[in-house]
């Protein structure tokens, strides 16, 4: 909503349409004006989890609020930290926040299978136009390893 509250009317419609499918409230949560009111509203809607960086640029920076949300949520909803979660900080985010589920991309740059490459044309951005970011099993394993 324009005032930074959760759009309860449209979320209720979404929840109805989802039926028995678990719904994660995405990082729009990080743009709410009152995260504790938003937490209670989202719980009342029946969402299964909230994906959040703790209203900060990264989950590590938002770990303080994440910890408060995890405590207030209890067993009613899962608080899932996301944004900047990597193998070098996931254990610290877990320790600081008390969260048990995490959202991360575990991506690496991979070359394209394109054989022909036109050196005269770019796709409008810096960097290699023939590279793509892909999630790799190696990075997933490396990211979750510190939690074991």
Residue ranges and their predicted role:
Residues 1-4, 47-60, 97-119:
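Glycine-rich phosphate-binding active-site loops on the catalytic face of alpha/beta enzymes
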Residues 5-27, 63-87, 125-148:
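Alpha-helix-loop-beta-strand connector modules within alpha/beta enzyme cores
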Residues 6, 34-37, 61-63, 91-92, ...:
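Short, well-ordered secondary-structure micro-motifs
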Residues 9, 31-45, 69-79, 85-104:
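Catalytic cores of alpha/beta
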Residues 10, 14, 20-61:
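Histidine/lysine/aspartate-rich catalytic loop segments that bind and position anionic ligands
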Residues 30, 80, 99-135, 139:
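Active-site pocket-lining/capping segments in soluble small-molecule metabolic enzymes
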